[in-house]
Amino acid sequence: MSKSDYIELEGVVKEKLPNTIFTVELENGHRILAHISGKIRKHYIRILPGDKVTVEMTPYDLTKGRIIFRHK
C-alpha cells in the first residue's frame, strides 16, 4: 500500500494500555486502538492521556491505527 492509501485523522489519547498501545478518541467520536510509529519510538517521544495526536489508518480495518504525530 502506498502512503496515499492511508487515512489520516486527528484525535485525543484517552487511555494508555500495555505494550505502547493507546485508546484514541477521534474527532468524529469513534474510539480506536493505536500503537506508536517507529520514528516516535526511536526518538523517545512521550505520549500521555490528553495529548492531541495524528493517527494513520488503513481503509481495511477502521478499528486500529498508528500514531504518527503528537501535537504540541
Swiss-Prot record:
Q: Name one Pfam family in it.
A: eIF-1a
> What SUPFAM superfamilies does the annotation carry?
Nucleic acid-binding proteins
GO terms assigned for molecular function = ribosome binding; rRNA binding; translation initiation factor activity
What is one cellular component GO term in this UniProt entry? cytosol
Q: Which UniProt keywords apply?
A: Cytoplasm, Initiation factor, Protein biosynthesis, RNA-binding, rRNA-binding
What is the role of this chain?
Answer: One of the essential components for the initiation of protein synthesis. Stabilizes the binding of IF-2 and IF-3 on the 30S subunit to which N-formylmethionyl-tRNA(fMet) subsequently binds. Helps modulate mRNA selection, yielding the 30S pre-initiation complex (PIC). Upon addition of the 50S ribosomal subunit IF-1, IF-2 and IF-3 are released leaving the mature 70S translation initiation complex.
Family as reported in the entry's similarity comment: Belongs to the IF-1 family.
The record's note on quaternary structure and interaction partners says: Component of the 30S ribosomal translation pre-initiation complex which assembles on the 30S ribosome in the order IF-2 and IF-3, IF-1 and N-formylmethionyl-tRNA(fMet); mRNA recruitment can occur at any time during PIC assembly.
- Classification via HAMAP family: IF_1
- Specify the protein name: Translation initiation factor IF-1
Q: Which organism is it from?
A: Ruthia magnifica subsp. Calyptogena magnifica
What taxonomic ancestry is recorded? Bacteria, Pseudomonadati, Pseudomonadota, Gammaproteobacteria, Candidatus Pseudothioglobaceae
Name the gene: infA
